[in-house]
Amino acid sequence: MEGRMQDRDIAIPQLPARSMERAAAFYRGLGFDFEVVSPNGDYAIAELGSLEVHFFLHQSLVPEQSSFGCYFRVGDVAQLYAAFSRANLPGAGIPRITALENKPWGMCEFAIIDEDGSLVRIGQEL
């Protein structure tokens, strides 16, 4: 994961993972590069194009009770929705993917809930 953006200030979300192996499989299935970067295996970085998310080990997390989440604002939400849809996530339960919709707050967006219950919204301005 060389060449990370270091020429500007950015905020990077951190999400919990009960298992780095399962998180890696899930996010790789969406097209992310995923690398465990800590020697003891409790921290990882996933990247997809300019999107970056970090993961910390949280083995006692209950996915149905998780309040973790993040929002990615992207330039082409329809393209990313099509790519994520190829992972064949269900429309209900954990994990899942929601429909791509125009929202009253001026965004076209969808969401995924990952295997650890984190809500990841992805949107583009209308």
Question: Which positions does each model-derived feature cover?
Answer:
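Conserved short beta-strand elements that form part of the metal-binding/catalytic scaffold
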Residues: 34-68, 119-124
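Conserved active-site alpha-helix within GNAT-family acetyltransferase domains
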Residues: 21-30, 110
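N-terminal beta-strand motif that seeds the catalytic metal site of vicinal oxygen chelate
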Residues: 1-21, 70, 125-126
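Acetyl-CoA-dependent GNAT
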Residues: 58, 97, 101, 124-126
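Vicinal oxygen chelate
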Residues: 20, 70-119
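Short glycine-enriched loop/turn motifs at secondary-structure junctions
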Residues: 6-9, 62-67, 104
